[in-house]
Amino acid sequence: MAERIFTINAPIDQVRSIVTEVFTRESWTVTPFSADTLQITRGKKGMSVAFGAFMGRNFYLSQNLQFGTGPHGETLVRYLSSTGSAIIGGALGMRKSLKTHAEYAEKLADALQSRDILMSVR
């Protein structure tokens, strides 16, 4: 499972809105998973079970974004890839999941940086 932690100098509600916009603009479905977590999905789960990673862009992926507050009041976003959806596609699915996570971690960092609120990514 891949993970990136973003430290952001903005209120948590503003950050949640920006993150939601980044992913919905890219055709992800964004749904609340718990009070502090958004689940993002894209692709077709049933077809991915049948055809695996050969589904191309329609391959089902599910990832999570956890929101919290750091020790100095900064907003923390933990962006996690999911191994569950990747297992559907075997080794190719795992590779696709990790590659997609890296791609969107970069897009999220760019969106936050363009607003001059990104403090760090680790």
Protein language model regions, located:
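Ser/Thr-rich, low-complexity intrinsically disordered terminal regions
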Residues: M1-R122
